[in-house]
Swiss-Prot record:
Reaction equations catalysed: tRNA(Tyr) + L-tyrosine + ATP = L-tyrosyl-tRNA(Tyr) + AMP + diphosphate + H(+)
Motif 'HIGH' region boundaries: 41-50
Record gene name: tyrS
Name assigned to this protein: Tyrosine--tRNA ligase
Subunit structure: Homodimer.
Superkingdom of source: Bacteria
Length: 420
């Protein structure tokens, strides 16, 4: 008997590997299943690289199953070697605690809590911190063969360049997590990225050896790739964070709206809860009227609203429209800084005020002759307003918050002028 959720995950391309495809399907058809996904607190915010595993877990919740979200307060003190070419820098306990605080708030925005299938948030330091070294070696290490661990991709890929015993034992700690959640909270499925396959299967194997447990399964989702070969999850400014202080909702919105025609339908399937009928319609729109970018706008709206809420989405759309139309005066200083974060930053002394000299000193125009031509031809805009007077002097009101001025040359070349 097929399972509606599994069929949906397959259609979305969200299933990479399963330890027992039929076993998982039978289990989901039989009962409300408790399953988990985890993340180590390596920073004080999640980034969009974390989104897909957690959104996949949320899809299970939408179908009546109960998600456990594990934050690795214990494993985060060690460091996961999976997908890393070199040793991680160990974090202090204080830093890990600070990171957990930030991530926990974001988890509450992604999942529903307080219902009969409400999410459960756990920290693995609560049980890993209680295990003594002797207990770790006798009760757990005895059941894990070194040859078995050496066969894991996450270990093999590091042997040539070296791996510490600390990171070598990481997979055992994550295996202990699955066993603990299985016995204490009846958790039967672990969900993770494709790089977590070795850690997931280690947990199932440890349960089998320790408890004779067979009712435990693993499901991984694919690595998110872009059609141009670039790494997903990075903008020109770096990582795209879920924390609005690190990546503003406007920047977040812009990241999604700028996805290519080649990637947008896949990302609609991955990152939104829109159904097949609507996504098929958006695909048709993309094919027939790509200039409208309806699919990209929908992707940006759906993901931004889910993570930041409707008010933040409306602000992001308003900022985008104002920047597109050149109506900069309708925006606050913070909104302008967010909007022009990636444009060239130039510095100007407070003594320079003549528009031609400003253009030369900042390098916006390459020569005095060109600067005068740019102004005379109406190619220069100060904070969105055209300036055609070569004798114009920048006034205090041209400095937004007394800090910066936005100068545009031509149709699309923006510069943020900062003062010293």
């Amino acid at each position: 008997m097929t399972n509606v959720l599994i069929e949906d995950l397959k259609w979305r391309g969200l299933i990479y590997q399963q330890t027992d495809e039929q076993g998982i399907e039978d289990l989901l058809n039989k009962e409300q299943v408790t399953l988990y996904c985890g993340a180590d607190p390596t920073a004080d915010s999640l980034h969009i690289g974390h989104l897909l595993p957690f959104l996949t877990l949320r899809r299970f919740q939408e179908h009546g199953h109960r998600p456990i979200v594990l934050i690795g307060g214990g494993t985060g003190m060690i460091g996961d070697p999976s997908g890393k070419s070199e040793e991680r820098v160990l974090q202090t306990e204080e830093q890990v605690d600070k990171n957990i605080e930030g991530i926990s708030k974001q988890i509450h925005n992604i999942f529903e809590f307080g219902t009969d299938h409400g999410a459960v948030l756990v920290n693995n330091r609560d049980w890993l911190g209680q295990i003594s070294l002797i207990s770790f070696l006798r009760d757990y290490g005895k059941h894990v063969g070194v040859n078995y661990m050496l066969g894991k991709d996450s270990i093999q890929s590091r042997l040539e360049h070296g791996i510490s015993y600390t990171e070598f034992t990481y997979t055992i700690l994550q295996a202990i997590d699955f066993g603990h959640l299985n016995r204490e909270l009846n958790c039967k499925i672990q969900v993770g990225g494709s790089d977590q396959w070795g850690n997931i299967t280690s947990g199932i194997e440890l349960m089998r050896r320790m408890y004779g447990q067979t009712d435990a399964y693993g499901l991984t989702i694919p690595l998110v790739t872009k059609s141009d070969g670039k790494k997903f999850g990075k903008s020109e400014s770096g990582a795209v964070w879920l924390d609005a202080e690190k990546t503003s909702p406007y920047e977040f919105y812009q990241f999604w709206i700028n996805q290519s025609d080649e990637d947008v339908i896949k990302f609609l399937k991955y990152f939104t809860f829109l159904g097949k009928e609507e996504i098929d319609r958006l695909e048709q729109s993309k094919n027939e009227a790509p200039h409208l970018r309806e699919a990209q706008k929908t992707l940006a709206e759906e993901v931004t609203k889910f993570i930041h809420g409707e008010d933040a989405l409306n602000d992001a759309i308003r900022i985008s429209q104002a920047l597109f139309s050149g109506d900069l005066k309708s925006l606050s200083a913070k909104e302008l800084k967010d909007g022009f974060k990636d444009v060239p930053q130039v510095t100007l002394s407070n003594d320079t005020t003549n528009i031609v000299e400003v253009l030369i000193e900042t390098g916006i125009s390459p020569s005095k002759r060109q600067a005068r031509e740019d102004v005379n031809n109406g190619a220069i805009y100060i904070n969105g307003e055209r300036q055609q007077d070569v004798n114009y002097a920048l006034a205090p009101e041209d400095k937004i918050d007394g800090e910066f001025t936005i100068i545009r040359r031509g149709k699309k070349k923006y510069f943020m002028v900062n003062y010293q």
